[in-house]
Amino acid sequence: MGGFKAESVDQAALASWWTVLNDPTLNQLVEQSLANNTTVKQAMARVTEARARRGIAGASFWPSINASTSGNRSSSDSVLTSDGQIVTGSREIYQAGLDASWEIDLFGGTRRAYESSTAQLGATEADLRDVLVTLLGDVALAYIDVRTTQSRLTFAERNLESQREVVDITGWRAEAGLATSLDVEQAKSSYSQTLAAVPQLESALEAAKNRLAVLTGQTPGSLEGVLGERKPIPVAPAEVIASVPAEVLRRRPDIRAAERRLAAQTAEVGVATAQLYPSLSLSGSIGVNATRTSDLISDGLHSNRYGISLSMPIFRAGALLQNIRVQNALVESAFATYEGTVLSAYEEVENALTSWANEQKRHAALVDSVESARIASELALMQYNSGLVDFQVVLTADRQLISTEDALAVSDGELTSNLIRLYKAFGGGWSVFPPAITQAAAP
């Protein structure tokens, strides 16, 4: 993994950063997670909700029109007329009409409310993109965990074979009187110690596979066919991002969401301020009355009413002014949240860059250490067989080799994982929208 060099961020590469690892299995898992992940589905539903709430706010710009109809029957005692006829006192009246009302947005309260709901929608859409960034990073990291643990298992199993041979050799030497029973028992103990680490690694491997299954919206255990075969850890590319323009970093979804929530809260100040001023409403109705339903259309009695109303708050004991102070305080809080989000983003990027650079140095040292440990282990066993050193030298060299090989496997995975964290810190993948998400994000 030597020869790394830094370059500035490329936005196109940032959008699909996981493809730089050139791993078809990882690409497949990413596609499955985008299509099936339950957290993404929840975020999509919240976008749909926010869009509907903006629609509710937008409806306030328009008049409200209602249709009504009613029928009434009244009766009274029978009356004897002067000509001797008896007339019953029952009467039927039917009514139908339309009522309309419209509150004029004189001082911008409705406009500010719509601006607030629009900004909230933008924040919710940014939250969805943030979910995507987190999901893609989590899927890639879990996948690297799988491959790293598989690599550690491979090292452990290979060392077990070597240690089994050492156990056999010490046994033969003991039978020939060239070694003691202590050597045999120490060899067996070293073998068993390595063997004891295997179940832990197998448990960690299953946990990583199950984590991937859940992230891709599947039941634990369902990815065995995809991940059962051991494959190498994806290698980080020779060129890695070392810098990112500030405008790219500001497009991180969490920063965008904080900025939109600040905008929404700023608009709420306008809503609260508008409540200090008069409100003007227009209203009207048209209707028709008849004694028979058939006459409502052709022979009814028509009526209409129009009106205008003006209301203005006179005394609210300072509640409206206090509400403005509340909204302004919330703006200050939202701005502080925005600033904190930006600072945290820069911190995350700097930490990711530092971790990657330091892991690169550690990895290079471990490569040299493993090479030396392998040579030392071979020499120790040769000298032991020649009677030049005691068995303790073999054990020490063997343990050193096992430790450094395992550390190198972990470093292989950590080097790629740190690159993933770096892309995640840049907000990589926020613009990825598969068909289902694209439909949810459409207006």
Regions found by a protein language model. Give the residues of each.
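Terminal intrinsically disordered/low-complexity segments used for targeting and assembly
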Residues: 1-35, 94, 118, 202-250, ...
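Short flexible linkers and secondary-structure junctions
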Residues: 1-138, 280-284, 303, 314-324
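Transmembrane beta-barrel architecture of outer-membrane proteins
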Residues: 26-28, 93-95, 141, 186, ...
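Sec/SRP-type N-terminal targeting helices
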Residues: 41-42, 58-59, 104-132, 182, ...
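Outer-membrane beta-barrel proteins
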Residues: 76-80, 181, 291-295
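Periplasmic alpha-helical coiled-coil/stalk elements that build and connect Gram-negative outer-membrane
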Residues: 110, 126-244, 355, 359, ...
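A short glycine-centered flexible hinge/capping loop motif at secondary-structure junctions
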Residues: 174-178, 384-388, 425, 429
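C-terminal structured "cap/appendage" subdomains that terminate the fold
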Residues: 377-416
